[in-house]
Swiss-Prot record:
PANTHER family: 1-(5-PHOSPHORIBOSYL)-5-[(5-PHOSPHORIBOSYLAMINO)METHYLIDENEAMINO] IMIDAZOLE-4-CARBOXAMIDE ISOMERASE. InterPro entries: Aldolase_TIM, His_biosynth, HisA_bact_arch, Isoase_HisA-like, Isoase_HisA-like_bact, RibuloseP-bd_barrel. The keyword Ubl conjugation does not apply. This is 1-(5-phosphoribosyl)-5-[(5-phosphoribosylamino)methylideneamino] imidazole-4-carboxamide isomerase. One of its GO terms (cellular component) is cytoplasm. It comes from Burkholderia thailandensis (strain ATCC 700388 / DSM 13276 / CCUG 48851 / CIP 106301 / E264). It catalyses: 1-(5-phospho-beta-D-ribosyl)-5-[(5-phospho-beta-D-ribosylamino)methylideneamino]imidazole-4-carboxamide = 5-[(5-phospho-1-deoxy-D-ribulos-1-ylimino)methylamino]-1-(5-phospho-beta-D-ribosyl)imidazole-4-carboxamide. HAMAP family: HisA.
Length: 251
């Protein structure tokens, strides 16, 4: 089970939002590259970046910070990024800069042909981000709820060739209420590609619960507010996940 620290970028700073609200941003660092270094030194094996300004603008907006992070840790671990990815040119630019994966969210829902083209042009590098509330997919920085069922879209996008799915329960994100394990497992069981859980991770108990269902196809979990607020000790949590993984493998 991969524990993947999130670095959310707003105006070049590392922040956390409450339920995707740009007006409710807490700044945790003015040096995102130093934050990336911290998580890698604590044992992170992948990083999750979000260009928050980009998500709302529809184009890259935190390039300098992203390049600084890649310069710091990009040679050591895979880095994935979402937010504002709406063109093949943007994907190519990001992959050339050293990103391992790009996450397509809103654009995948609104323009499935773009996602299909991206999977074809950059096979193995495309992750789809599905943000849902009560099983329905949301777009545009969570501001619009669609009528699409998350499982229907996930299966369609799997057919296109996406590498994995980041599934966020937006009712819980940034609220420290616990991961929606049931919904995440349901999605993972419905597809044959890995699912990365996101939204609401609050403590070590969530990690233990996720490890129990890892074999359903849950590859990892994105760690946001809990590791910044101190509710979750990242290094201890990754160690615990590895221990549980070993125990389950031995069973």
């Amino acid at each position: 089970m991969l524990l993947i620290p999130a670095i959310d970028l707003k105006d070049g700073q590392c922040v956390r939002l409450k339920q995707g609200d740009m007006d409710q941003a807490t700044i945790f660092s003015e040096d995102p590259a130093a934050m990336a270094r911290k998580w890698v030194d604590l044992g992170a094996r992948r990083l999750h970046l979000v260009d928050l300004n980009g998500a709302f603008a529809g184009k890259p907006k935190n390039l300098e910070a992203i390049e600084a992070i890649l310069g710091e840790v990009g040679d050591e671990i895979p880095v994935q990024l979402g937010g504002g990815i709406r063109s093949l040119e943007t994907i190519e630019k990001y992959l050339d800069a050293g990103l391992s994966y790009v996450i397509i969210g809103t654009a995948a829902v609104k323009d499935p042909g773009f996602l299909r083209d991206a999977c074809s042009a950059f096979a193995g590098n495309i992750i789809v981000g599905l943000d849902a509330k009560d099983g329905k997919v949301a777009t545009d920085g969570w501001s619009k709820l669609t009528g699409h069922e998350v499982i229907d879209l996930a299966q369609k996008f799997e057919d296109y060739g996406v590498e994995s799915i980041v599934y966020t329960d937006i009712g819980r994100d940034g609220m420290l209420q616990g991961i929606n394990i049931e919904a995440t497992v349901k999605l993972a069981q419905a597809v044959g590609i890995p699912v990365i859980a996101s939204g609401g991770l609050s403590n070590i108990v969530d990690i233990e619960k996720l490890c129990e269902v890892e074999d359903e196809g849950i590859e990892g979990v994105i760690c946001g507010r809990a590791i910044y607020s101190g509710d979750l000790d990242f290094a201890a949590a990754q160690k615990r996940a590895d221990e549980l993984n070993g125990e389950l493998d031995d069973a």
